Amino acid sequence: MKEKINVTIWNEYVHETTSERIGAVYPEGIHGAIKKMLSKYDNFNITVATFEMEEHGLTDEVLNNTDVLIWWGHCKHAAVSDEIALKVKERVLDGMGFIALHSAHASKPFKLLLGTTCRLKWRENDEKERVWVIEPSHPIAKNVPEYLEFAQEETYGERFDIPTPDELIFVSWFEGGEIFRSGCCYNRGLGKIFYFRPGHEEYPTFYREDVTQVIANAINWACPDGITKPILGHVEPLEKVRDKFEGMDESLKKHEYIK
């Protein structure tokens, strides 16, 4: 594991500045709460970025120096720059970890990476949620209790239009009867992706120790470490082999294709 993991927390930071009620829950923004809670872990270097920053705070320099990107978004999904979303996708394919929280299921980077609508059932009704750990030996479940109970949360329900997860770590039950795949792992290219469901902006979810533990575990799991990047495109043989073009004109050796 890397001695220090560079973590960037991206948050729209809109609800907290436009709603007094939500601003009272997260006076320093959702990103500020997550940063504060993660600061107890001494192996994280934490940076924050928000929608209103230039390039949404995700410049090439920031992205290239980010090991794991955490994303929380809701009301500005469509307004996020297509160019920035594509850059995030490419960085994940190149090895950067990506953690999508709650309504980030509908974010541009997440949908680009998963290739589906990522739509779901939902209801805002202050209902109880119980998040069950179904893979207790997985690194993301390390030091996490058998279940996490939230007295009030936004309800999500199946069907969740996502590809079948490579690994499913958590499943949620809601007071109104819905169930939901609430902790999903994916591999895309050289990068790892984790989706975690809890975290509606009206509730102090991100101040909880157990939620912070899940996020910290996901950072450690998703962090690229010791990746030997494969050589792609045309390569010379490792062993001595016959040259099928020997004696032919050099122009015959050239092929037009996407490298």
Q: Which residues does each PLM region occupy?
A:
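Hydrophobic residues in well-ordered beta-strands that form the structural core
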Residues: 48, 100-101, 195
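Solvent-exposed loop/turn segments at secondary-structure junctions
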Residues: 13-15, 53, 75-78, 104-109, ...
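Catalytic beta-strand/loop cores that center a nucleophilic Ser/Cys/Thr
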Residues: 44-45, 64, 120-197, 232, ...
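Short, solvent-exposed loop/turn elements at domain surfaces
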Residues: 15-19, 178, 204-205
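A glycine-rich, often tryptophan-bearing local segment used as a flexible ligand/cofactor-contacting loop or short
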Residues: 76-143
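Extracellular ligand-binding/catalytic regions of CAZymes and related secreted enzymes
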Residues: 2-4, 124, 188-194, 198-259
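Aromatic-Pro/Gly-enriched surface loop or interdomain linker
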Residues: 1-65, 233-259
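Structural motif
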Residues: 68-72, 195
